[in-house]
Structures are given as C-alpha cells and as structure tokens.
Design a protein with these regions (language model features):
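Amphipathic alpha-helical assembly/interaction segments
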Residues: 1-136
Length: 136
C-alpha cells in the first residue's frame, strides 16, 4: 500500500465513527422527514431535491472514506460540502414558502451548522495528511 494510503487509513477512522458522518446521517433522516410535509405538488420537485441533497452529504463522506488516498477523499468531502450548501438553501426556501415551520427550520439549520463544522474539521485533517506526502 502506498505511503499516503497507509497514512490516510491509519489517521482517519472508519466512516461510521466519524462525527461528520454521524451528524450527516441525522441530517439526512431529518431532511427526509421534513420533505414529507411539503405540499403534494412539491414531492417530485423541492421535496425530492431536499431528500437527495441530504442523502448525498453522508453518502459522500462514506464513499470518500473508502477511497485510496487523501486527494480522492477530499474530492468526496468537497462534494459533501456542496450538497450541504444545497440543503441549507432548500430549507431556507422551504421556510420562506411556509413548507416548514420555525421549529423544524431551527432544528434543520442547527444540524446543517453542526454537520458543516465537523465536515470542515475532517477536511482540514485530510488536507494535513495529503500535505505530508504524495497521494495515490
């Protein structure tokens, strides 16, 4: 196994133990629950987009964790961050359109913030790994 792969797997734990993945999983579940309350005419539009963006955050963290090399892992984490920004935008739209109430919005917003913080920390950790040596 190349040095960068050994470093990647010895420093970063299995994805299920990562706080970023755990928060993202909770966020995905809450996004799916919130989307159920959207109007029928939004179920194949904004509600579906919220579900897919929510799922994408944790799925990309998990998939990136199984990849070889920090550079590839970072790419998946960047995609997870982009999906998180999509979730943030959709929940703001949903609040403004009165599809979700203030309590649901507050809960989802808090989850996106916490997920973002832990995801950013994981990205910094992975960036430190790749800075120490070439990636595969």
């Amino acid at each position: 196994m190349p040095l960068s792969c050994r470093a990647h797997h010895s420093v970063v734990a299995h994805y299920k133990t990562l706080k970023a993945w755990q928060h993202a999983q909770r966020l995905a579940i809450e996004c799916s629950r919130a989307a159920r309350g959207f109007p029928d005419y939004e179920q194949n539009a904004l509600a579906d987009q919220l579900r897919r963006a929510g799922y994408s955050v944790s799925l990309n963290i998990a998939e990136g964790n199984t990849r070889r090399g920090a550079r590839e892992y970072r790419r998946y984490l960047d995609t997870a961050r982009a999906s998180l920004a999509e979730v943030e935008t959709i929940i703001e739209m949903a609040r403004d359109l009165d599809y979700i109430g203030p309590a649901d919005f507050g809960r989802l917003e808090a989850l996106t913030v916490e997920t973002g913080k832990t995801l950013w920390g994981l990205l910094r950790k992975i960036a430190g790994i790749s800075a120490r040596g070439p990636t595969s």
